[in-house]
A protein has these predicted regions:
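Compositionally biased linear targeting/interaction segments
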Residues: 2-3, 7-319
């Protein structure tokens, strides 16, 4: 009798253990399946968000294509400069959220690249002057400029106050210099000595795309000072013309506006003069796409260049 009870007890215990094992297996399968479903769902949402962001870029490009015919945004069709510079107001407009249907949305903001400092084009002196004019201590600005140049240049020879790969390795840095162009302005956060507060202060005036030309009719004084041959006197005179809504159409008008020392400095620097622009011909489009109720946001950045009256997308990045 006891033997029978022992057998039945063992069988019951075995059944319980089997039930526990099957439950654990079912739970694991459920967790794995849910994880995979989330991956698939996020992938699908990312794909649709990417399409929405790309739609934002294309819709904005189509709007820009109409401006040479209609005149610039915010200006009369027959207003001064509307034919010569049809994009003059395009960089100051931001599109509201646009619904595409099927619960997809985008928002796109155009930025005049001529009002930004291209950190892949600017030289060390120009970068130092930009940083100093942006209220950064001159000694700190000089060190930052050298470290940024060391990160960007192709060699491993450290500037006096800069930093190369070995310096980052010794300090246990997570990211090492690429010895090539920056892919995004926020990569500056990896440069030695860069703080969040300083980066957040200067990043809105930085870019990594475009020709590096600066629009004298719209750029701020710090951005103007990043140009070779641009003096503080010249930048102040240009800023005064901007405040007075006096448009500068060409280099001759600019030189006539400047005090003699500032004019001579610019005339003696053909590289700086070549990087002057008097109209908006490059726009950086920053588009965000998403689905209703989804936390996934897809960002697409594109460079649109005006060739004659045609806007062409010459570069884009999606992340």
């Amino acid at each position: 009798m006891r033997r029978g009870r022992s057998v039945r007890g063992f069988a019951l215990l075995s059944a319980l253990w089997l039930l526990v094992a099957l439950s654990a297996l079912a739970l694991e399968v459920s967790v794995v399946a849910r994880h995979r479903r989330l991956i698939v769902a996020n992938t699908l949402e990312s794909v649709r968000g990417e399409r929405a962001a790309a739609s934002g870029v294309e819709h904005e490009r189509a709007r820009l294509a109409r401006l040479p015919v209609r005149g610039g945004d915010g200006a009369s069709w027959n207003g001064a400069g509307s034919a010569v510079d049809p994009w003059q107001h395009a960089g100051s407009s931001a599109t509201d959220t646009v619904a595409l249907g099927d619960d997809a949305f985008y928002a796109v903001a155009p930025v005049d690249v001529g009002t930004l400092v291209n950190i892949n084009v600017v030289d060390e002196v120009g970068l130092t002057r930009f940083l100093t004019a942006s209220s950064i201590d001159p000694m700190t600005a000089d060190a930052f400029a050298q470290a940024i140049m060391d990160w960007r240049d192709a060699d491993d020879f450290r500037r006096l106050r800069g930093a190369e790969r070995d310096d980052y390795i010794k300090n246990g840095a997570r990211e090492l210099p690429s010895n090539g162009p920056f892919e995004a302005a926020d990569q500056l956060r990896f440069v030695r000595g860069m703080s969040r507060s300083i980066l957040s202060h200067i990043e809105p005036q930085l870019t990594v795309v475009g020709s590096g030309q600066v629009n004298v009719n719209k750029a701020s004084e710090p951005v103007l000072l990043s140009l070779p041959g641009m003096t503080t006197l010249a930048a102040a005179a240009i800023a005064g013309a901007q405040r007075g809504h006096r448009r500068i159409e060409n280099l001759r008008q600019l030189l006539d506006l400047l005090p003699v020392p500032a004019r001579m400095a610019l005339e003696q620097n053909p590289i700086g003069a070549a990087r002057l622009a008097f109209e908006t011909h490059e726009l950086e489009l920053r588009s965000v796409g998403w689905l209703k109720g989804s936390p996934v946001r897809v960002h697409e950045t594109a460079l649109v260049t005006r060739i004659g009256t045609t806007p062409l997308v010459t570069w884009r990045r999606t992340e």
